[in-house]
Design a protein with these regions (language model features):
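Extracellular/periplasmic juxtamembrane segments that couple receptor/chemosensory ectodomains to their
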Residues: 181, 201-228
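Solvent-exposed, extracytoplasmic
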Residues: 64-80, 150-196, 200-202
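Extracytoplasmic/periplasmic sensory segments of membrane signal-transduction proteins
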Residues: 27-36, 42-118, 167
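Charged, alpha-helical scaffolding/interaction elements associated with membrane systems
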Residues: 23, 114-115, 221
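Extracytoplasmic/periplasmic ligand-binding sensor regions of membrane-associated signaling proteins
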Residues: 78, 84, 89-167, 174, ...
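Allosteric regulatory "coupling" segments in signal-transduction proteins
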Residues: 95-105, 193-204
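Extreme N-terminal signal-anchor transmembrane helix of membrane signaling/transducer proteins, especially
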Residues: 1-19, 23
């Protein structure tokens, strides 16, 4: 059984492989989905507010960005981050762990430069090749709307594992978080999970093209439901 949640629109779908689902199972899935989305939304909002607050602090000491990043090293460690990074508009990046990076051309970097605050899908870390999730937000000039660069908080890809690992259906249930394009944001670490799934639409399409199309249409229109 797979419960699939979407960020940012936080809709949920259920996929049962095998016997036909009765209403009790559907109701149980819906309740599990609602609880999970509340927990994920709470964590997401708390983390994003924290990153945006850091961006404000950085803007206030922007005349010494290197020293500001040094001060953030202990902050990153305290909150379980892999690193905190600040990127100038040209992509040149300062990091709390000394990683040498240039973020120019990165999708999330470019979105933040346009003023968006974003949680990335699961992506490959340019520093070491491991899977990560990244919160990014713009850093504004303290006295204007000028964007000075992008602040990023980098987490290992198990960022929501404690929430997604909550047991459902005697330990047989597991959860993914996907975005509005169907891309996996947070994968499940359950032993029965589909670890190789990158996009849920593409995955379902391999088995049932009509189901994949229906799923995509429902989610794009703000619907909810299940498929077998």
């Amino acid at each position: 059984i797979i419960l699939v949640g979407l960020i940012p629109i936080t809709l949920f779908f259920s996929n049962s492989i095998g016997e036909t689902m009765d209403q009790h199972i559907i109701d149980t899935m819906e309740n599990s989905a609602e609880l999970c989305v509340e927990m994920v939304e709470g964590r997401y909002e708390t983390d994003m507010q924290m990153i945006e607050s850091l961006a404000v602090q950085l803007s206030l000491s922007f005349d010494e960005p290197e020293r500001a990043m040094e001060r953030m090293s202990s902050f990153a460690e305290r909150y379980g981050m892999k690193r905190v990074a600040f990127s100038y508009p040209d992509g040149v990046t300062l990091t709390t762990d000394g990683s040498e990076l240039n973020m120019k051309g990165g999708e999330n970097f470019e979105r933040a430069l346009k003023g968006e605050s974003v949680l990335s899908t699961a992506i490959v870390d340019r520093a070491d090749g491991n899977m990560i999730n990244v919160y990014v937000c713009p850093v504004y000039h303290k006295d204007s709307d000028e964007i000075l660069g992008v602040l990023a908080a980098v987490y290992h890809s198990d960022i929501f594992e404690d929430i997604l690992a909550a047991s459902t259906f005697d330990g047989e249930g597991y959860t993914y978080i996907i975005d509005s394009k169907g891309d996996v944001v947070i994968n499940s670490h359950h032993t029965n999970a589909i670890s190789e799934m990158v996009n849920i639409y593409d995955y379902v399409k391999e088995y049932d093209e009509n189901a994949a199309s229906s799923l995509k249409t429902l989610l794009e229109n703000g619907g909810e439901g299940f498929f077998e």
